[in-house]
Design a protein with these regions (language model features):
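Catalytic cores and adjacent flexible loops of soluble metabolic enzymes
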Residues: 1-332
Length: 332
């Protein structure tokens, strides 16, 4: 099992190329597989009278700035993922060679844009399902069904209350799209980063089928950058990554073989706990072993029989004392 961890940088770069680069470096150092920014052009997302229009405008950066960020991600071997909100941002994402983009939940019913995504060169689409109805999600996925799809559960509540995460919905989504072999689940929590649930919730989501996790990262909570309410600082994010990597290890690689593909450690445990066939009393050579002559006990002998049924009616070649292990060399 492999869990992809996406450092959600969103709007935390605040339109500053230097800040964006610092976030990329922090994400790479913490062990994230990918970074994700919102590639915003105010005019393709909102009207000038919208309350956050000026904020969106402040996030705009030049094509050269985004090219430099892509090059930095390549240097640190970390994937660059972009939220795109229209033709302009999608065009730049394609120009940059971006393979994975995110469809923000704001566009779950934006049919025209979904059709453009379907025809684009991107390979994977992260579909944000926060606040979306099931039929809206189904319609969106059907339009982009030729792409690899990561269906993301979770929404931003600045921060999101624990009880509103509704992780049980992931099983409903999994069942609803079980016929789509190209759809996998992702989880994006936005809980208070200082609360233990900021690690336990995504860990639980992995157990519910999430193979991609999105977690907000900030340069420092005290800086109160955009989206800081649910963002971990670099040290916290590193702990989060380490926990998820340990979950990957614990998940293991069980198989359908008779021994489930046991590890060497478990095989040794099996040897240590197995009971072996030993005598209940002193037995003389030539005796035919019956049900009252032997029993299963733990013993230091690793050569003794473990299946008691196999020794019944066998004849002893030599005499055995009480609690003696019964081996293949003792019977005929």
């Amino acid at each position: 099992m492999k869990v992809e961890i996406v450092a959600e940088l969103a709007q935390g770069f605040e339109g500053c190329p230097k800040q964006a680069k610092l976030l990329v470096k922090a994400a790479a150092k913490a062990g994230a597989n990918a970074t994700k920014f919102q590639l915003i052009y105010a005019d393709e997302l909102a009207t000038p009278d919208y309350e956050y229009y000026e904020l969106f405008s402040s996030l705009e950066m030049s094509d050269d700035d985004w090219t430099n960020i892509k090059n930095l991600c390549d240097k640190y071997h970390i994937e660059l993922i972009l939220d795109v909100f229209g033709s302009t941002s999608l065009s730049l994402a394609e120009k940059l060679g971006i393979e994975t983009i995110k469809l923000h939940a704001t566009d779950i019913n934006n049919i025209g844009f979904l059709e453009k995504l379907a025809k684009s060169s991107v390979k994977r689409i992260m579909v944000g399902a926060g606040g979306a109805h099931l039929e809206e999600i189904k319609n969106a996925i059907e339009i982009v069904s030729m792409k690899q799809i990561i269906l993301f559960h979770g929404f931003q509540g600045y921060p999101t209350p624990i009880e509103d995460n509704q992780i049980s919905r992931m099983q409903l989504l999994k069942n609803a799209f079980s016929d789509y072999k190209n759809v996998v689940l992702g989880f994006s929590d936005h809980v208070d980063p200082t609360h233990p649930s900021s690690i336990t919730l995504p860990s639980y989501a992995v157990g519910q089928g999430a193979v991609v996790l999105e977690k907000h990262l900030t340069l420092g909570c005290c800086m109160e950058l955009e989206d800081h309410e649910a963002a971990m600082n670099p040290d916290q994010f590193k702990v989060f990554v380490d926990v998820i990597r340990n979950i990957e290890l614990a998940h293991g690689h069980s198989t359908l073989e008779n021994d489930f593909g046991m590890s060497a450690t478990e095989k040794q445990y099996r040897k240590n706990i197995r009971r072996h066939v030993v005598t209940l009393d002193n037995l003389q050579a030539g005796k035919s072993i019956g049900t009252g002559d032997v029993v299963l006990k733990r013993t230091s002998s690793v050569e003794a029989f473990t299946d008691i049924q196999t020794v019944y009616d066998k004849k002893l070649i030599s005499s055995l004392h009480e609690n003696a292990p019964v081996t293949k060399g003792d019977v005929e």
